[in-house]
Amino acid sequence: MAVKIRLKRFGKMRAPYYRIVVMDSRAKRDGRAIEEIGKYHPTEEPSYIEVASERAQYWLSVGAQPSEQVAAILKITGDWQKFKGLPGQEGTLKTKGEKEAFVAPEKGSVIIPEAITKKASKSEAAEAEAETTEAE
C-alpha cells in the first residue's frame, strides 16, 4: 500500500482550511485518513501551520511520500531538513506576535475620546418641527 502525506480540505468556498493527513495514495482527496498529523490555514496572515513533528518524522521514515504542498510546509517547519539530515532544522516558521493589552487614556490626557451623539428625544424633535413651521 503506497502511503502519502497530503492535504485534506475543509472550510467554505474561498475560505480553505487544510489538515495534513497520512492516507493511502488511491483514496479520495477528502477520504478516510490513516492519521491526522497537522493543520494548515493559508488565509491567515501569517499562515497558521501546526505539524506534529514526531509523527511526521515517523511516517517519513517508514516511506510515506509527501505531496509537493506538504513538502513545502515540512521545509518551513524544519521537519524535512531534520529527516534528510540537512542544516536549517529549526525551520523558518513565522508566528503571530502577541497583541498589546488595551490601556484607557488617563483623565488628564490630551487624547479626546470620540463623542457619542445621543438620539434626540421625541419632545425635542417635536419642538424642532414647531420652530420650522413658525419660521415659514
From Swiss-Prot:
Protein's gene: rpsP
Entry keyword annotation includes Ribonucleoprotein: yes
Organism this protein belongs to: Pseudarthrobacter chlorophenolicus (strain ATCC 700700 / DSM 12829 / CIP 107037 / JCM 12360 / KCTC 9906 / NCIMB 13794 / A6) (Arthrobacter chlorophenolicus)
Upper classification of the organism: Bacteria, Bacillati, Actinomycetota, Actinomycetes, Micrococcales
HAMAP family attached to this UniProt entry: Ribosomal_bS16
InterPro entries xrefs: Ribosomal_bS16, Ribosomal_bS16_CS, Ribosomal_bS16_dom_sf
Protein name as annotated: Small ribosomal subunit protein bS16
Family label: Belongs to the bacterial ribosomal protein bS16 family.
Key words, A-Z: Ribonucleoprotein, Ribosomal protein
Superkingdom, taxonomy of origin: Bacteria
One BP annotation, GO: translation
GO molecular function annotation: structural constituent of ribosome
Cellular compartments per GO CC: cytoplasm; small ribosomal subunit
NCBIfam families in the cross-refs: PRK14520.1, S16
One Pfam family recorded for the sequence: Ribosomal_S16
Matches recorded under PROSITE patterns: RIBOSOMAL_S16 (PS00732)
